[in-house]
């Protein structure tokens, strides 16, 4: 699997994958997770640019809590193309899926319309609702995201 936006490894430390490639735009983050998982040969980490110089693909492309941080249209477009291009069978996205401005560093997008228009070889499989839907009275205990699963046709 390839995770686009692996972050600091907190979520990864809770999961077990037979093979894992984690990508991020932050050199500091990549350095941290390389050290954190140095003894685990099933995990590899790259800066996105480094990965794209010699890309590979995997059965699953994964995007967790990244999409709504992509406030720039060009970066969003590139991210989505990469997410779907380098996935062989499945893409799983954990994100909001509505067009709505939020703050300077958050932009909710209806990414499903992008997939429908630009990744026609992929079909929507299912949406798994978040067990803790967003509650403005409990913003640190809830989330505005759900899981969206796509399968290659």
Regions picked out by a protein language model, each given a short descriptive name:
Residues 1-56, 73-153:
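Class I (Rossmann-like) S-adenosyl-L-methionine-dependent methyltransferase catalytic domain
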Residues 62:
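A conserved beta-strand element that flanks and buttresses the S-adenosyl-L-methionine
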Residues 65-69:
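Short catalytic micro-motifs in class I SAM-dependent methyltransferases
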Residues 59:
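Polar, enzyme-active/binding microenvironments
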């Amino acid at each position: 699997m390839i995770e686009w936006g692996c972050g600091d490894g907190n979520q990864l430390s809770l999961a077990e994958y037979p093979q894992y490639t984690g990508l991020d735009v932050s050199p500091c983050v990549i350095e941290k997770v390389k050290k954190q998982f140095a003894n685990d040969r099933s995990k590899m980490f790259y800066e996105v640019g480094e990965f794209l110089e010699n890309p590979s693909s995997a059965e699953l492309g994964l995007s967790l809590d990244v999409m709504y941080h992509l406030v720039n249209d060009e970066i969003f477009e590139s991210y989505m193309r990469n997410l779907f291009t380098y996935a062989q069978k499945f893409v799983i996205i954990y994100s909001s899926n509505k067009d709505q401005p939020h703050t300077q560093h958050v932009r909710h997008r209806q990414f499903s319309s992008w997939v429908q228009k630009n990744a026609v070889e992929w079909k929507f499989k299912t949406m798994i609702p978040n067990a803790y839907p967003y509650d403005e009275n409990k913003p640190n205990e809830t989330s505005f995201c759900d899981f969206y699963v796509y399968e290659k046709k």
